Amino acid sequence: MWALRSLLRPLGLRTMSQGSARRPRPPKDPLRHLRTREKRGPGWGPGGPNTVYLQVVAAGGRDAAAALYVFSEYNRYLFNCGEGVQRLMQEHKLKVARLDNIFLTRMHWSNVGGLCGMILTLKETGLPKCVLSGPPQLEKYLEAIKIFSGPLKGIDLAVRPHSAPEYKDETMTVYQVPIHSERRCGEQEPSRSPKRSPNRLSPKQSSSDPGSAENGQCLPEGSSAGVNGKAWGRDPSLVVAFVCKLHLRKGNFLVLKAKELGLPVGTAAIAPIIAAVKDGKSITYEGREIAAEELCTPPDPGLVFIVVECPDEGFIQPICENDTFQRYQGEADAPVAVVVHIAPESVLIDSRYQQWMERFGPDTQHLILNENCPSVHNLRSHKIQTQLSLIHPDIFPQLTSFHSKEEGSTFSLPTVRGECLLKYHVRPKREWQRDTTLDCNTDEFIAEALELPNFQESVEEYRKNMQASPAPAEKRSQYPEIVFLGTGSAIPMKIRNVSSTLVNLSPDKSVLLDCGEGTFGQLCRHYGQQIDRVLCNLTAVFVSHLHADHHTGLLNILLQREHALASLGKPFQPLLVVAPTQLRAWLQQYHNQCQEILHHISMIPAKCLQKGAEVPSPPVERLISLLLETCDLQEFQTCLVRHCKHAFGCALVHSSGWKVVYSGDTMPCEALVQMGKDATLLIHEATLEDGLEEEAVEKTHSTTSQAIGVGMRMNAEFIMLNHFSQRYAKIPLFSPDFNEKVGIAFDHMKVCFGDFPTVPKLIPPLKALFADDIEEMVERREKRELRLVRAALLTQQADSSEDREPHQKRAHSEEPHSPQSKKVRAQ
């Protein structure tokens, strides 16, 4: 393997670019389902789908806000897109590339938190257009995400406002039903509108904060986007329900019956007969009148399903009195097959809501999605963690989950609580299907690992080595404790979530280093019922840069932290956020148009913590002092790193003397080396394997050996590698530079300084656990390097032939022409 790479150098093929520009990607071929649709043409009428089912993507638990996937052979739809939905769809093979319609029931982070990542993924798949339906703020939300995503070229994002007429496609007609709460803007629950701290980042104060004026994102003096949020487009009093009516499915033509009656089956004359009877018309054949019922099965009626969200009691009466819903209750023309209720238990136990549910009749099914739906969602993550815990149960603790303590409501109706992947078939037969739901069987996971060749032996060998190792001269403190929540890059995947690392400074103080989408869900699965305590302990968040995989989990952390403080009876204080000033523009836009969040944050511009930087104002100086005091730090330093514009790394120096350095995303960076000199721990990105140095430069990331090299130059006591490309889903490839000072991070891995001698010794059992994956990656690398060798040889041959050709021409022209050569030329 390493010999192959050595062949490349004498052949003159670069293994490392000196700074080449990123190569443009070739245009993608149209997706298959779009090519099929284009062939059918605009006039094609399918007559309604044969198969339609609703499937729960996320059951509405605290770690997985409610999301519903609807399938037909013609279309795919998604209702709501909270954080983690993209990851779940990828894990459970629900095709994202087929989604051309996303319906959103309200403008709240639990409904739209995963939308940014989903849009970026849809763009990458080559989907040309996606239509978003729901609240009017959707258009402003899309404008807001462009602050950090860029212009989103290549995908047409259309917004269908809730006031638009019905939408119709090959599968169904969708009617949007706007519902306004009795509680207007500003009439929130006391726990959801805490008293504001003087240190918060408010709309008015933002004009005096550094960076806000230069970004042009502060609100005008004297304006208010708090109580009167509607003035700026924010409207929490609006939800949008969706009534979806399937197209009538024509009956099936009975071929055998037609033959019995002597009809011309198998000839061109049968086509108009089939068309007529499918339309319910009688036909006359050879003087006989034949009723449509004799030749065709009954048509499948245009059943209806309804998706409705009722966030609190203020929406109950408007829902009960809504005219559109009343048309589908009692003796309705179109029977309602199922109603999906996204509602908390406080709504479901209300007698008014239960009576409204009963009015749909006994044949209508009801699906509940809320926090009382305990369901495992990320099965692969549970499986991997269970198997890793066999190696070291403290470093790889088993996952848990958060369960609501509220008692579930009881119903006299046919009611089902959601589970991940639960299906309800509307067509061809109305029925629940549970064979796809998840079973988190830890015994099965353990048995599977124990059957792997050499795994048990390598674990036993590791334990013997640890017992034989000399005891450390001094026992190191449990703190700081590093919990890796997301160790993958770019997009959330089934094994590795995107960037986030929790540093527990003490039993009651912690800092979050980056906060990618799904960070709160990872915390829930790691800490379970202790999640509120963990959120209350969170004192600061560092956001390294504005790529979506590093900060789109922040808003959920802010909202859930507010909930945690209220539930534990603790006073509200804004969270200290160290970030590039450009983050403020996104927060301001979301606050103005979607949901009030600025009171959650006291922001410190990352540039103000660079060595030698001038602190621009007394308020920021006070916040920096508060950060150091609260976290018991001597220093919180940042430096610019080599990634995108305004990308930072950071170093935390504790009063007890230890130093933790975090690289964020970067190529090897001298400024980081200098800032991190003599670090106790360096957490450095290692996105790509060795041999992909040129790609690393194009993408402004580091390879494994480059990251280790930075740590060695820094004289770091220990190096933890993370932020691996998702091509290394379970484990990265090891380089020859790995040594006793290097470890690799996994999601939910927990280490403290006392674990430094242990972590490198985990590599042999890890290699045994993931032997098949490593073998596959090695094969891929060898094939890639062989291709490079062949390409280099061809280039070399082409160059040498070009060099020989002019010489041959000169020699040929100098020779006298013989009669034989003339004969050859003539031939």
Swiss-Prot record:
<dbReference type="GO" id="GO:0005634">
    <property type="term" value="C:nucleus"/>
</dbReference>
<keyword id="KW-1135">Mitochondrion nucleoid</keyword>
<keyword id="KW-0809">Transit peptide</keyword>
<keyword id="KW-0819">tRNA processing</keyword>
<comment type="function">
    <text>Zinc phosphodiesterase, which displays mitochondrial tRNA 3'-processing endonuclease activity. Involved in tRNA maturation, by removing a 3'-trailer from precursor tRNA. Associates with mitochondrial DNA complexes at the nucleoids to initiate RNA processing and ribosome assembly.</text>
</comment>
<dbReference type="InterPro" id="IPR001279">
    <property type="entry name" value="Metallo-B-lactamas"/>
</dbReference>
<feature type="compositionally biased region" description="Polar residues">
    <location>
        <begin position="199"/>
        <end position="210"/>
    </location>
</feature>
<dbReference type="InterPro" id="IPR036866">
    <property type="entry name" value="RibonucZ/Hydroxyglut_hydro"/>
</dbReference>
<keyword id="KW-0479">Metal-binding</keyword>
<feature type="transit peptide" description="Mitochondrion">
    <location>
        <begin position="1"/>
        <end position="16"/>
    </location>
</feature>
<keyword id="KW-0378">Hydrolase</keyword>
<feature type="compositionally biased region" description="Basic and acidic residues">
    <location>
        <begin position="181"/>
        <end position="192"/>
    </location>
</feature>
<feature type="modified residue" description="Phosphoserine">
    <location>
        <position position="197"/>
    </location>
</feature>
<dbReference type="GO" id="GO:0005739">
    <property type="term" value="C:mitochondrion"/>
</dbReference>
<feature type="modified residue" description="Phosphoserine">
    <location>
        <position position="193"/>
    </location>
</feature>
<feature type="modified residue" description="Phosphoserine">
    <location>
        <position position="617"/>
    </location>
</feature>
<feature type="modified residue" description="Phosphoserine">
    <location>
        <position position="735"/>
    </location>
</feature>
<feature type="region of interest" description="Disordered">
    <location>
        <begin position="794"/>
        <end position="827"/>
    </location>
</feature>
<feature type="modified residue" description="Phosphoserine">
    <location>
        <position position="818"/>
    </location>
</feature>
<feature type="modified residue" description="Phosphoserine">
    <location>
        <position position="207"/>
    </location>
</feature>
<comment type="similarity">
    <text>Belongs to the RNase Z family.</text>
</comment>
<feature type="modified residue" description="Phosphothreonine">
    <location>
        <position position="795"/>
    </location>
</feature>
<dbReference type="Pfam" id="PF12706">
    <property type="entry name" value="Lactamase_B_2"/>
</dbReference>
<keyword id="KW-0540">Nuclease</keyword>
<dbReference type="Pfam" id="PF13691">
    <property type="entry name" value="Lactamase_B_4"/>
</dbReference>
<keyword id="KW-0496">Mitochondrion</keyword>
<dbReference type="GO" id="GO:0004549">
    <property type="term" value="F:tRNA-specific ribonuclease activity"/>
</dbReference>
<comment type="subunit">
    <text>Homodimer. Interacts with PTCD1.</text>
</comment>
<dbReference type="InterPro" id="IPR027794">
    <property type="entry name" value="tRNase_Z_dom"/>
</dbReference>
<dbReference type="GO" id="GO:0046872">
    <property type="term" value="F:metal ion binding"/>
</dbReference>
<dbReference type="GO" id="GO:0042645">
    <property type="term" value="C:mitochondrial nucleoid"/>
</dbReference>
<dbReference type="GO" id="GO:1990180">
    <property type="term" value="P:mitochondrial tRNA 3'-end processing"/>
</dbReference>
<dbReference type="InterPro" id="IPR047151">
    <property type="entry name" value="RNZ2-like"/>
</dbReference>
<dbReference type="GO" id="GO:0042781">
    <property type="term" value="F:3'-tRNA processing endoribonuclease activity"/>
</dbReference>
<keyword id="KW-0862">Zinc</keyword>
<feature type="region of interest" description="Disordered">
    <location>
        <begin position="15"/>
        <end position="46"/>
    </location>
</feature>
<protein>
    <recommendedName>
        <fullName>Zinc phosphodiesterase ELAC protein 2</fullName>
        <ecNumber>3.1.26.11</ecNumber>
    </recommendedName>
</protein>
<keyword id="KW-0597">Phosphoprotein</keyword>
<keyword id="KW-0539">Nucleus</keyword>
<feature type="modified residue" description="Phosphoserine">
    <location>
        <position position="202"/>
    </location>
</feature>
<keyword id="KW-0255">Endonuclease</keyword>
<feature type="compositionally biased region" description="Basic and acidic residues">
    <location>
        <begin position="801"/>
        <end position="817"/>
    </location>
</feature>
